[in-house]
Amino acid sequence: MIISAASDYRAAAQRILPPFLFHYMDGGAYSEYTLRRNVEDLSEVALRQRILKNMSDLSLETTLFNEKLSMPVALAPVGLCGMYARRGEVQAAKAADAHGIPFTLSTVSVCPIEEVAPAIKRPMWFQLYVLRDRGFMRNALERAKAAGCSTLVFTVDMPTPGARYRDAHSGMSGPNAAMRRYLQAVTHPQWAWDVGLNGRPHDLGNISAYLGKPTGLEDYIGWLGNNFDPSISWKDLEWIRDFWDGPMVIKGILDPEDARDAVRFGADGIVVSNHGGRQLDGVLSSARALPAIADAVKGDIAILADSGIRNGLDVVRMIALGADTVLLGRAFLYALATAGQAGVANLLNLIEKEMKVAMTLTGAKSISEITQDSLVQGLGKELPAALAPMAKGNAA
């Protein structure tokens, strides 16, 4: 099979993975409108082509939280990574490390912090949810600090799980889910051998270490469902800010006022994100939300963005819309499921090449030169002008 883009990895992953796993990573909430808009809105952003600029000294390097990045990309926190490839978090982290970008470990990873951190040279980032069990949160923070994690990514857009209809149909949840998953696994031999048999243990490493017992998929669903905390407020986050002395990033911002609150709170960064369309369907895509947020807080706080990014051109688009760095989620997971560490490494090389093409043809020699001037019509107050015709069409 020829691999030339993330879409090729997606097609391969769909063949390799049991349906319950593929649709868990590929699906979104409700009718998946926001999931689709994330990709489609970003693809509508038009860039200005500029020529004869002498781009021989082009550079993708950037700095974030005093870390040097080979390009303005980090791997996003993705739960259950170790179910998509054998010890998947370790493989993805190694690929990111070799490319000179950060890897973010999810709270609900298969591999625990203590397994992933020693496998790479650069400090990884750690993602934490807002949970009722504050003892677990403190324990996770202590372990992250002990392992040398440099940045905390605090996810705030999951006070309750989203309604993901695909999961019920695919076997991730719903009637007879365990039996359906078993039948799917035995009919996907490549995954069954590589991950199902040789990727054990399939515990949720960070949780089982705290609970003191193995935690499988059913435990994951049950424990998380009982621990999401809808009562959380900015006030409740103060003890985390006091406890964590490294950079802290608030993930799940879609409104300029929430971005301003993050600045007032003292966060070091925000992630403009709708959780990949997996939480509230019908909210703005990240591409639409980003310009107004950048207009409100650019320069006061680091702005990261995710949701809908599938290639290097999308990275350039997000930066032109106001992001400093982007997070890759599904794109790297497709590659991981297909070819493990080598797949992720190849995807990152593709993204780097695609960025270089886009920057060369827009006349941006450095990341700092990718601005709203790189867009065909600049920025509107709420969404890029290049998206305005589409928005009008949707309203008709």
Curated annotation (Swiss-Prot):
Is activated by 2-fold in the presence of high concentrations of sodium and potassium ions. Is almost completely inhibited by a high concentration of pyruvate (10 mM). Forms homooligomers. It comes from the Bacteria. NCBIfam families: L_lactate_LldD, PRK11197.1. Induction: Is induced by aerobic growth on L-lactate, but not by aerobic growth on D-lactate or glycerol or by anaerobic growth on glucose. Disruption phenotype: Cells lacking this gene lose the ability to grow on L-lactate as the sole source of carbon and energy, but can still utilize D-lactate. Catalyzes the conversion of L-lactate to pyruvate. Seems to be a primary dehydrogenase in the respiratory chain. To a lesser extent, can also oxidize DL-alpha-hydroxybutyrate, but not D-lactate. It catalyses: (S)-lactate + A = pyruvate + AH2. The gene is lldD. One of its GO terms (biological process) is L-fucose catabolic process. Its EC number is 1.1.-.-. The active site is at H275 (proton acceptor). Its cofactor is FMN. Signal peptide: none annotated. Substrate binds at Y24, Y129, R164, R278. One of its GO terms (molecular function) is FMN binding. InterPro entries: Aldolase_TIM (IPR013785), Alpha-hydoxy_acid_DH_FMN (IPR012133), FMN-dep_DH (IPR000262), FMN_HAD (IPR037396), FMN_hydac_DH_AS (IPR008259), LldD (IPR020920). This is L-lactate dehydrogenase. CDD domains: alpha_hydroxyacid_oxid_FMN. It is a peripheral membrane protein. Keywords: Cell inner membrane, Cell membrane, Flavoprotein, FMN, Membrane, Oxidoreductase. It comes from Escherichia coli (strain K12). PROSITE patterns: FMN_HYDROXY_ACID_DH_1, FMN_HYDROXY_ACID_DH_2. FMN binds at residues 106, 127, 155, 251, 306-330. It is found in: Cell inner membrane.
